[in-house]
Amino acid sequence: MAEGDEAARRQQPQQGLRRRRQTSDSSVGVNHVSSTTSLGEDYEDDDLVNSDEVMKKPCPVQIVLAHEDDHNFELDEEALEQILLQEHIRDLNIVVVSVAGAFRKGKSFLLDFMLRYMYNKDSQSWIGGNNEPLTGFTWRGGCERETTGIQVWNEVFVIDRPNGTKVAVLLMDTQGAFDSQSTIKDCATVFALSTMTSSVQVYNLSQNIQEDDLQHLQLFTEYGRLAMEEIYQKPFQTLMFLIRDWSYPYEHSYGLEGGKQFLEKRLQVKQNQHEELQNVRKHIHNCFSNLGCFLLPHPGLKVATNPSFDGRLKDIDEDFKRELRNLVPLLLAPENLVEKEISGSKVTCRDLVEYFKAYIKIYQGEELPHPKSMLQATAEANNLAAVAGARDVYCKSMEQVCGGDKPYIAPSDLERKHLDLKEVALKQFRSVKKMGGDEFCRRYQDQLEAEIEETYANFIKHNDGKNIFYAARTPATLFAVMFAMYIISGLTGFIGLNSIAVLCNLVMGLALTSLCTWAYVKYSGEFREIGTMIDQIAETLWEQVLKPLGDNLMEENIRQSVTNSIKAGLTDQVSHHARLKTD
């Protein structure tokens, strides 16, 4: 059977990863799991469940595809539907157990022991034989990542609970966080999506719970919470901290009880803690309904250093196997199963398909802010603070020049002051020590300049409002329109152009009504939008009609005066010469 699979795989291109998968036969039992050869021969990361032949037996199916070129994710809807919409399970409440955490920390390795339990849960020796290779989700030793996107086991287990109900159990494996090919957004999306869709999220950590582990958890869960609809309760269900390679059993013993004591100590909010540390812990408590922790010993040197290790129990330390026998039933025993709920309602297999579709669309869009690395977030905050400080220097200085209690200042003087103070603000910005480098900081300097120009435009309007002639521009314009229409109406009526006279009277009436309305708005402060509209119309008339007309008349008058002066001068000169000749 393995040879047939190998031949089928050779015929498929690597792009087959995107091909739609066929649903496995759920009646296939444990024999398929235990009869496979080592994972290196049976399942490869690039050959996940692409052919009908492979799909006839239980195996991992990638339902969320990771595109490395554009750092985007795609849901394989058909594969997910074929797994969860099988007739015998689609209306059952679902239990989703997911394992997430940093890459190369043994998530897939742990899930394969969960598979052994699910196929042999009625046996005391479910953990397997000493010489049996570990198969199921693909895993291997080494330092490079193995899993990408999100995978699920294509056989959904139907379990009878002690209360007589049946539930469907789905096991989920996720792409490891913080590898060299994933952005912070990639890591946050995978972790958030798996947390949103799982009822139990196992947070797989190595050796200890570091403060940065909690900060990343805060970031990832907040990214998930933002994508969910407005809810008034804790958005996620159970988070199980799984501390691998625990080296301090003399302080906190292996297992659940020692983990509980350790977690209480780590997540305790103390009065003397910095506010940032308190906020991280409060956020985690507010996001999850249940928190737990399990301390797991190191599996042994053979596991860590043997390149040919294939999961055989004979190579694993007894302490690890003993605690593993306690951990897996704690998560998957019928009496311990946690059914998936969203907003207090149980979720069926059919419902979960729709939630997956809705959530992936959110993360494919641009509605959510992009999470950033700590350096980038700190650099942005640092530069924004420098921008705010420099802008404040500019605003305070300009207030001294043309603030509310200062008299009107000539526009040319105001512009000169603006340019001087703008340069002072830019020097202030440049003098602040900032993170991110020159190119990064240049964007914020451009932002500062734009904000200063916007503020300057407001100061110009404020200064113009103090000019009595500017304040009287609207009534003067309307009065000029009324006067002009009155004269034109009289002249056109006198020569018999009654239609034009009526039109001029109508315009004069509108101008008079506008003038009265404007006066009422300025007096009462009501209907300010109407007053603004009248000001804008008057401004347009002034700039486009009256001012050019006045300038032309002024130029014509000046030109005529100069011409007359020249003529008078020439006449005087000619007269003077004539008198001289006569004399």
Curated annotation (Swiss-Prot):
Positions with a binding annotation for GTP: R104, K105, G106, K107, S108, F109, R244, D245, V303
Intervals, Lumenal compartment: 498-499
Binding site for Mg(2+): S108
Single biological process term from Gene Ontology: endoplasmic reticulum membrane fusion
Topology feature Cytoplasmic, residues: 1-476, 521-583
A Gene Ontology term for the protein's cellular component: endoplasmic reticulum tubular network membrane
GO MF term set: GTP binding; GTPase-dependent fusogenic activity
Annotated segments matching region Disordered: 1-45
Group of enzyme by EC: hydrolase
Protein's membrane topology: Multi-pass membrane protein
Catalytic activity annotation: GTP + H2O = GDP + phosphate + H(+)
Transmembrane residue ranges: 477-497, 500-520
EC number assigned by the record: 3.6.5.-
PROSITE patterns xrefs: G_GB1_RHD3
Keywords, in A-Z order: Coiled coil, Endoplasmic reticulum, GTP-binding, Hydrolase, Magnesium, Membrane, Metal-binding, Methylation, Nucleotide-binding, Phosphoprotein, Transmembrane, Transmembrane helix
Positions of the GB1/RHD3-type G domain: 91-336
Region described as Linker: 466-474
Positions carrying Phosphoserine: S24
Region of interest (3HB (three-helix bundle) domain), ranges: 374-465
Family annotation (CDD domains): GBP
Polar residues bias locations: 24-39
Assembly description: Monomeric and homodimeric. The homodimer, transiently formed by two molecules on opposing membranes, is the active form mediating ER membrane fusion. Interacts with REEP5 and RTN3; these proteins are involved in endoplasmic reticulum tubular network organization. Interacts with ZFYVE27; both proteins are involved in endoplasmic reticulum tubular network organization.
PANTHER family assigned: GUANYLATE BINDING PROTEIN
Family according to the record: Belongs to the TRAFAC class dynamin-like GTPase superfamily. GB1/RHD3 GTPase family. GB1 subfamily.
Name this protein carries in UniProt: Atlastin-2
Organism of this sequence: Mus musculus
Organism placement in taxonomy: Eukaryota, Metazoa, Chordata, Craniata, Vertebrata
